[in-house]
């Protein structure tokens, strides 16, 4: 049986919020079978638990934001991406602010944190959402689409008219049957343009942003002295984001995802469209791990090993 997974022990870290610039304490705790990923604002007078779900995403302008009873947790996509890549089904995420810390701007720190805690299989079948009919959302020339596929693959195209991005490639296709999330995707950092960062700071945003947690570009080049971690780091980060955005649906998807210039809003709209049509998906489990898609039939640390 392909089993659900959580972490073995509690782990903690401290970072800063990308937009607030304030210190944030993050604690990951094991959770029982069928709990899902649950975020908890433990800094509030009465802590608020917000289970990750497509319908709980209330703001997607700058990040994916979970909202419930007036409480919010922002910038969840990198941590959710790490959970997807490591096959974590159940987890409590305690946070002392309304933002998940940005860490180094990638999912790498969260992968390290989860692996440090250890991963434990649970005595319950892992549930998948198997897409059975195509679902698509469009917004002008942008689109995001899910098609039936026995596995999980993504094809993402960005369109940033910038010399440094042009040089590294604007499109990427990955099938996790033969690609390692941890090695090939997890370390791709978020990126921004210097003039946009200044504008955002004037609006009280991006106060925690720096070259320690983002790739920063001027009109012509990358400003970070250490350059890129991957030749195609820009499009890989957008794929990393998409993996995290899609994982809020509650279970891993068995599907092929195709997107052009998609972002948090379009990704969430795609999930809502999927869930609105019950004939377009089914929940499946695998009693025989050998019959599960490659990439999920793992025996070791990661889902997309």
UniProtKB/Swiss-Prot annotation:
Similarity annotation: Belongs to the LpxC family.
Enzymatic reactions: a UDP-3-O-[(3R)-3-hydroxyacyl]-N-acetyl-alpha-D-glucosamine + H2O = a UDP-3-O-[(3R)-3-hydroxyacyl]-alpha-D-glucosamine + acetate
Named cofactor requirement(s): Zn(2+)
HAMAP family: LpxC (MF_00388)
Keywords for the protein's UniProt record, in alphabetical order: Hydrolase, Lipid A biosynthesis, Lipid biosynthesis, Lipid metabolism, Metal-binding, Zinc
Function: Catalyzes the hydrolysis of UDP-3-O-myristoyl-N-acetylglucosamine to form UDP-3-O-myristoylglucosamine and acetate, the committed step in lipid A biosynthesis.
This protein's pathway: Glycolipid biosynthesis; lipid IV(A) biosynthesis; lipid IV(A) from (3R)-3-hydroxytetradecanoyl-[acyl-carrier-protein] and UDP-N-acetyl-alpha-D-glucosamine: step 2/6
Cellular compartments per GO CC: membrane
Name of protein: UDP-3-O-acyl-N-acetylglucosamine deacetylase
UniProt signal peptide: none
GO terms of biological process kind: lipid A biosynthetic process
GO molecular function, one term: UDP-3-O-acyl-N-acetylglucosamine deacetylase activity
Residues forming coiled coils: none
Binding site for Zn(2+): 78, 237, 241
Primary gene name: lpxC
């Amino acid at each position: 049986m392909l089993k659900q997974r959580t972490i073995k022990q509690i782990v903690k870290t401290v970072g800063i919020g990308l937009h607030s610039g304030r210190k944030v304490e993050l604690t990951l705790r094991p959770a029982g079978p069928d709990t899902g990923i649950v975020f908890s604002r433990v800094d509030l007078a009465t802590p608020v638990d917000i289970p990750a779900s497509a319908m709980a995403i209330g703001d997607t302008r700058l990040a994916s934001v979970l909202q419930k009873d007036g409480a919010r947790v922002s910038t969840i996509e990198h941590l959710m991406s790490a959970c997807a890549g490591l096959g974590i089904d159940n987890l409590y995420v305690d946070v002392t602010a309304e933002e998940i810390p940005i860490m180094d701007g990638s999912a790498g720190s969260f992968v390290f944190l989860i692996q440090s805690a250890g991963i434990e299989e649970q005595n319950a079948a892992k549930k998948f959402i198997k897409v059975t009919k195509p679902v698509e959302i469009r917004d002008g020339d942008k689109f995001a689409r899910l098609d039936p596929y026995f596995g999980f693959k993504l094809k993402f195209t960005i369109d940033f008219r910038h010399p440094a991005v042009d040089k590294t490639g604007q499109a990427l296709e990955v099938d996790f049957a033969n690609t390692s999330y941890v090695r090939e995707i997890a370390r791709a950092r978020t990126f921004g343009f210097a003039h946009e960062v200044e504008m955002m700071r004037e609006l009280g945003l991006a106060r925690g942003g720096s070259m320690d947690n983002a790739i920063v570009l001027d009109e012509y080049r990358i400003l970070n002295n250490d350059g890129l971690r991957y030749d195609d780091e820009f499009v890989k980060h957008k794929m990393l984001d998409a993996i995290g955005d899609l994982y809020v649906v509650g279970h891993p998807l068995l599907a092929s995802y195709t997107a052009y210039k998609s972002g948090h809003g379009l990704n969430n709209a795609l999930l809502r469209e999927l869930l609105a049509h019950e004939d377009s998906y089914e929940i499946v489990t695998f009693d025989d791990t050998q019959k599960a898609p490659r990439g999920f039939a793992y025996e070791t640390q990661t889902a997309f090993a």
